[in-house]
From Swiss-Prot:
SUPFAM superfamilies: Scorpion toxin-like. CDD domains: neurotoxins_LC_scorpion (cd23106). Disulfide bonds join C11-C59, C15-C35, C21-C42, C25-C44. Has the structural arrangement of an alpha-helix connected to antiparallel beta-sheets by disulfide bonds (CS-alpha/beta). GO terms for cellular component: extracellular region. This is Putative alpha-neurotoxin RjAa13. Keywords: Disulfide bond, Ion channel impairing toxin, Neurotoxin, Secreted, Toxin, Voltage-gated sodium channel impairing toxin. One of its GO terms (molecular function) is sodium channel inhibitor activity. GO terms for biological process: defense response. It is found in: Secreted. It comes from Rhopalurus junceus (Caribbean blue scorpion). Residues 1-60 form the LCN-type CS-alpha/beta domain. Expressed by the venom gland.
């Protein structure tokens, strides 16, 4: 699947470089990833079906963990 990976607080990962997002996505078993610069967030392609991605829920910043 594709989407914005989220941390424990349901927050997207902010980015400025494609390399950061590629590493983050590959760590989550995705095929690839990049920094979507229109909203400065990592976007992953080829994630496993059970990987959490951003949905309509609110971001709870206290939950940031890698």
């Amino acid at each position: 699947k594709e989407g914005y990976p989220v941390d424990w607080g349901n927050c997207k990962y902010e980015c400025m470089s494609d390399a950061y997002c590629k590493d983050l996505c590959v760590d989550r078993k995705a095929k690839s990833g990049y920094c979507y610069k229109l909203n400065w967030s990592c976007y992953c392609e080829g994630l496993p079906d059970d990987s959490p991605i951003k949905t309509n829920g609110h971001c709870r910043p206290g939950g940031r963990r890698k």
